[in-house]
Amino acid sequence: MMGSWKHCLFSASLISALIFVFVYNTELWENKRFLRAALSNASLLAEACHQIFEGKVFYPTENALKTTLDEATCYEYMVRSHYVTETLSEEEAGFPLAYTVTIHKDFGTFERLFRAIYMPQNVYCVHLDQKATDAFKGAVKQLLSCFPNAFLASKKESVVYGGISRLQADLNCLEDLVASEVPWKYVINTCGQDFPLKTNREIVQYLKGFKGKNITPGVLPPDHAVGRTKYVHQELLNHKNSYVIKTTKLKTPPPHDMVIYFGTAYVALTRDFANFVLQDQLALDLLSWSKDTYSPDEHFWVTLNRIPGVPGSMPNASWTGNLRAIKWSDMEDRHGGCHGHYVHGICIYGNGDLKWLVNSPSLFANKFELNTYPLTVECLELRHRERTLNQSETAIQPSWYF
């Protein structure tokens, strides 16, 4: 009887061990097969990108650098989608960054941006437009649930193009980020149609060069921008569309005799400046005054950063700071034209814009649409990852390669 019991126990243990080995080897084989397929796709993509740089034309039918969010656990998603999961250098470890990302559509393009800028030492706040579809909201929430250093903004806005809600979305994230335990040095604001042209390490090195100064490119308002803050504007929001209208009512003068500047909505801010913006009465009064202006995110940051004595201020900075590469429709004589198409006067980049983009000194470029011009995004993505890994001081995991 005892011998029979021992025999059964041995048999059960052996079967369990065989099952474990089978499952382990099957998963290992699947991961290796996935990595081999990914490598093949990346190699084909690299050749296609090279041909594009040589002036050839491609019309791909599907994306090469696929992601697997719908059918994966978080671990599988991060491995199969090639996220970098370790800090790549001591320099980057000692200079963590914070990001705000405002999004309302096009999950695929956002996912590529997030994968490109993601590093475990950084922290990410995503503002999800209240008007976004339920499917989009669900996909974003599912993605962010896999990353302990990424989260949704605690306060949400229905964002209107050109309205105060766009600035408020960034401020909502900023409030969450200053409460974060991550000791970030600068916060960079982005939107879901941005893409980085520089690696995380290059961005860190660029920001360190400013020695604690905020980067808010801008000047005194040109003639075409004066009306933005001279007249009262109103946000209109309904179930069909949303927009800002200009009224004939004049605005009161700016608070505290502030000189209003005009600049870019894209900035890089120190933590001390972020706290100033959220707490100082000067900043709070400017925000209140700006609520009925047009596109206040293009005057709010730069106006505060031109005031002497404000933390990290640059009173005479002008357009200093290569934060964003943008092709405006009225500046084709400077950039040579858009090879995609224009929306709101801004180029949605196509394949023919790639050479211009990779030669840009800017940290990021805007705007992209993965579904419309997939190779434009993926050629930049492949180049960005190759350069990221080439700069690494950390042993590279096989899954980090595309």
From Swiss-Prot:
Lumenal side: 24-400
Effect ascribed to mutating R228Q: Defines the adult i phenotype
Catalytic activity: a beta-D-Gal-(1->4)-beta-D-GlcNAc-(1->3)-beta-D-Gal-(1->4)-beta-D-GlcNAc derivative + UDP-N-acetyl-alpha-D-glucosamine = a beta-D-Gal-(1->4)-beta-D-GlcNAc-(1->3)-[beta-D-GlcNAc-(1->6)]-beta-D-Gal-(1->4)-N-acetyl-beta-D-glucosaminyl derivative + UDP + H(+)
Compartments in which it is found: Golgi apparatus membrane
UniProt function note: Branching enzyme that converts linear into branched poly-N-acetyllactosaminoglycans. Introduces the blood group I antigen during embryonic development. It is closely associated with the development and maturation of erythroid cells.
GO cellular component assignments: Golgi membrane; membrane
GO molecular function: acetylglucosaminyltransferase activity; N-acetyllactosaminide beta-1,6-N-acetylglucosaminyltransferase activity
Pfam families, per database record: Branch
PANTHER family listed in its UniProt record: GLYCOSYLTRANSFERASE 14 FAMILY MEMBER, N-ACETYLLACTOSAMINIDE BETA-1,6-N-ACETYLGLUCOSAMINYL-TRANSFERASE
Keywords annotated in UniProt: Cataract, Disease variant, Glycoprotein, Glycosyltransferase, Golgi apparatus, Membrane, Signal-anchor, Transferase, Transmembrane, Transmembrane helix
Glycosylation sites: N41
The name this protein goes by in its record: N-acetyllactosaminide beta-1,6-N-acetylglucosaminyl-transferase
Topology in the lipid bilayer: Single-pass type II membrane protein
Organism in which the protein naturally occurs: Homo sapiens (Human)
Annotated pathway: Protein modification; protein glycosylation
Family: Belongs to the glycosyltransferase 14 family.
Enzyme nomenclature, EC number: 2.4.1.150
Residue intervals annotated with topology Cytoplasmic: 1-7
